[in-house]
């Protein structure tokens, strides 16, 4: 498949399981908690998206670029040695498949959304683009599409994340983007998002904010999900070709939750498919130094949406911690909160140490170095595989490659580069 969002997912009359209501809510989650200045821009964006999906020329251009520029469709790869590792001569353990989003142009799933939103920005006449980034992959993807279309690009990135992801900072600059360090708060993704929103409020007439996850005010959770839905739709077709049916389990890491939502969306109404999101437990959930928002969070409002958040007893947003810059966020997309509440999706958390061990294992067994974010999903196989039988099929969203994380992993392992 080379296409974008399938036609059956554009219909506003879909079940509320797979679509927010007219107020932009998934159950009680979501909404628009933003300054009045931004409401017209959000209305304009939602309307532009609705019109674009109905426009054959928009879909044709997006499909063409997804195929020739991004490199879609991405393969569904059978991880035979990883499968053998977890079976260990027993009848337990599933067959493991990887949805190779790491093979996209720029090395992650992020470009699916960045490309789609850039085309919408052009459609709306907005030539100045801003974005937030944590691990740098969304920043690189945004800078890439801005270079492709000749758009001004400003990326907000926490100073701590710039230190951890120096390679991606230079990549963004090489692509012509202005990378603006954020020093407030923990100098990570939450603070970068806050600065991007402040910029947008000031420059809303000329600027489009390419938000990088299924978070933020409506219509962003829906919009970002829709641009990533191609992941799950390809997976559904590829599974039927590979083993004749839908998978038993879908597994993906969750920070804000865009890669997981892109994989899950096509399967939400198929109750035979388990959907599992894996959060960052950091130093351990019990230590308080983690980013396990769904596991430990409470309902609150952050960055324009109501969702589960990490909060202290007074309701103040707490600092998140993860070795992975892309998961180091104290909130989560509202649709994930909703899927958890209604019992449709499951969520677990793994530690920094477990993620690094999984990254090394996958690298040595499959010759694929996953991103630290993705490594959290791989790490959960240790607990999941012994519970699944030999005939089970599991698909992991390999959301990004780990080149950007080599220095961080080397430092953690005590190696010098």
Swiss-Prot record:
CC annotations in GO: cytoplasm
Function per UniProt: The beta subunit is responsible for the synthesis of L-tryptophan from indole and L-serine.
Co-factor(s): pyridoxal 5'-phosphate
SUPFAM superfamilies: Tryptophan synthase beta subunit-like PLP-dependent enzymes
HAMAP family, A to Z: Trp_synth_beta
Family: Belongs to the TrpB family.
InterPro entries, A to Z: Trp_synth_b_CS (IPR006653), Trp_synth_beta (IPR006654), Trp_synth_beta/beta-like (IPR023026), TrpB-like_PALP (IPR001926), TrpB-like_PALP_sf (IPR036052)
Name recorded for this polypeptide: Tryptophan synthase beta chain
Keyword Magnesium: no
């Amino acid at each position: 498949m080379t296409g974008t969002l399938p036609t059956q997912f554009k219909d506003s009359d879909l079940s509320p399981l797979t679509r927010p209501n007219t107020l932009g809510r998934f159950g009680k989650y979501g909404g628009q908690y933003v300054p009045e200045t931004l409401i017209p821009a959000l209305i304009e964006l939602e309307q532009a998206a609705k019109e674009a999906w109905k426009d054959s020329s928009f879909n044709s251009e997006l499909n063409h670029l997804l195929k020739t520029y991004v490199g879609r469709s991405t393969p569904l790869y059978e991880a035979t040695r990883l499968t053998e590792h977890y079976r260990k001569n027993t009848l337990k353990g599933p067959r493991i498949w990887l949805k190779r989003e790491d093979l996209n142009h720029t090395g992650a799933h992020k470009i699916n959304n960045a490309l789609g939103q850039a085309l919408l920005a052009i459609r709306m006449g907005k030539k100045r683009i801003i974005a937030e980034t944590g691990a740098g992959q969304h920043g690189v993807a945004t800078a890439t599409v801005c270079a492709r279309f000749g758009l001004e690009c400003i990326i907000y990135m926490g100073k701590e994340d710039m230190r951890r992801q120096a390679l991606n900072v230079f990549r963004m600059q090489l692509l012509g983007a202005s990378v603006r360090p954020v020093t407030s708060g923990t100098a990570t993704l939450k603070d970068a998002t806050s600065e991007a929103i402040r910029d947008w409020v000031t420059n809303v007439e000329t600027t489009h904010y390419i938000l990088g996850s299924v978070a933020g005010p409506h219509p962003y959770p829906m919009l970002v999900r829709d641009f990533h839905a191609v992941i799950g739709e390809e997976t559904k077709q590829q599974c039927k070709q590979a083993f004749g049916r839908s998978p038993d389990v879908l597994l993906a890491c969750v920070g804000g939750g865009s890669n997981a939502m892109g994989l899950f969306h096509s399967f939400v109404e198929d109750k035979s498919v388990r959907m599992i999101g894996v959060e960052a437990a950091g130093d351990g959930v019990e230590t308080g130094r983690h980013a396990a928002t769904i596991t430990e969070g409470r309902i609150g409002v952050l960055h324009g949406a109501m969702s589960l958040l990490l909060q202290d007893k007074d309701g103040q947003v707490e600092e998140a911690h993860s070795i992975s810059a892309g998961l180091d966020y104290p909130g989560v997309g509202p649709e994930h909160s909703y899927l958890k509440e209604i019992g449709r999706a499951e969520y677990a958390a793994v530690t920094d140490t477990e993620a690094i061990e999984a990254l090394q294992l996958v690298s040595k067994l499959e010759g694929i170095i996953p991103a630290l974010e993705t490594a959290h999903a791989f790490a959960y196989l240790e607990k999941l595989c012994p519970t699944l039988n030999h005939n089970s099929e599991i698909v992991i969203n390999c959301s990004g490659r780990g080149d950007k994380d080599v220095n961080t992993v080397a430092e953690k392992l005590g190696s010098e580069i």
